[in-house]
């Protein structure tokens, strides 16, 4: 379709808002939320990872609300949904789920070099989703927006995404080679092991999935080149606040399925309050206050209200489920 005839997408325009002035226009992904929604619309088993701990014992308010809202929508569409995060973030995530009346089906990500393999083997997800979760940079460290390491407090949950990508690459190589029935598969690919679909949401460049736009990030200066994640995913959603990106996916799921899946502005206020009461802090101010990325609860509630208006705007032709 010619550019002049492309439909105005209100979800994209809301997600592209940049209240933190991070310059996300340089790496924003138009249509990202819709592509993620298409991938998730018929998901069977979803594992959602979230939680960004900015300092020892200080999980931030961005991430768990988005994970809870997206997980609820996917459960309403029939998927089995579980969550994993660091032990320090579990109370915040559980509080967000409780605020929505959702089961706290979450567990602390285990320690150990084989944790990613063990979790994926046990959970057997068809879709792996990250909402505001640190992804390693080129040097292997996890850095905040100031370039300071947060590795001591954030376990390497991105190992699961790296493993999923390696498995997909191995599977594709196996298919291309078209082995005879008598030939064995490479050790890294098990019989019947379907590739995972991977989706991520981020807002700063240092999260899981930002490897998709690393080239654009590194052109933003030396600091961004240091902190930019190398971890890639199938579908990346960039937003001014990561929670908004998750809400954008839910709004698009609603448009695709014709169902009102998004939470309400009142729910949003309760989510933020519940997370703060459970010990979460604002990721920018590092204060225990009812804000997310230095924006008050009313601002986030307004974004939810605006995204909710898009539900009556049908998805692009041919995209409804």
Residue ranges of each PLM-predicted region?
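C-terminal functional extensions of proteins
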Residues: 205-321
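Conserved mixed alpha/beta catalytic, RNA-binding, or beta-rich assembly cores of soluble enzyme
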Residues: 63-64, 127-128, 133-166, 195-259
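Short internal beta-strands
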Residues: 79-88
């Amino acid at each position: 379709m010619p550019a002049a005839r492309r439909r105005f997408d209100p979800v994209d325009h809301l997600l592209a808002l940049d209240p933190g002035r991070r310059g996300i226009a340089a790496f924003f992904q138009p249509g990202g939320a819709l592509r993620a929604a298409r991938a998730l619309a018929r998901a069977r088993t979803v594992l959602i990872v979230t939680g960004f701990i900015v300092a020892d014992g200080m999980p931030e308010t961005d991430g768990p609300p988005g994970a809870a809202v997206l997980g609820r929508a996917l459960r309403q569409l029939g998927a089995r949904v579980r969550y994993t995060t660091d032990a320090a973030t579990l109370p915040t995530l559980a509080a967000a789920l409780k605020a929505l009346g959702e089961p706290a089906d979450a567990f602390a990500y285990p320690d150990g070099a084989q944790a990613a393999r063990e979790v994926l083997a046990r959970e057997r997800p068809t879709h792996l989703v990250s909402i505001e979760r640190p992804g390693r940079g080129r040097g292997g460290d996890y850095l905040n927006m100031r370039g300071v390491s947060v590795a001591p407090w954030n376990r390497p949950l991105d190992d699961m995404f790296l493993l999923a990508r390696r498995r997909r690459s191995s599977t594709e190589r196996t298919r291309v080679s078209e082995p005879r029935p008598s030939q064995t598969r490479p050790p890294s690919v098990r019989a019947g092991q379907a590739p995972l679909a991977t989706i991520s949401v981020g807002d700063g460049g240092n999260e899981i999935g930002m490897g998709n736009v690393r080239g654009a990030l590194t052109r933003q200066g030396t600091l961004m080149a240091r902190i930019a994640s190398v971890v890639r995913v199938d579908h990346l959603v960039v937003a001014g606040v990561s929670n908004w990106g998750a809400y954008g996916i839910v709004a698009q799921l609603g448009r695709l399925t014709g169902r009102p899946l998004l939470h309400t502005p009142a729910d949003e206020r309760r989510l933020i309050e519940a997370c703060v009461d459970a010990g979460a802090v604002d990721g920018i101010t590092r204060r225990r206050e009812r804000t997310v990325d230095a924006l008050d609860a009313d601002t986030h509630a307004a974004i939810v209200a605006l995204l909710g208006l898009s539900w009556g705007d049908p998805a692009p032709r041919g995209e409804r489920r």
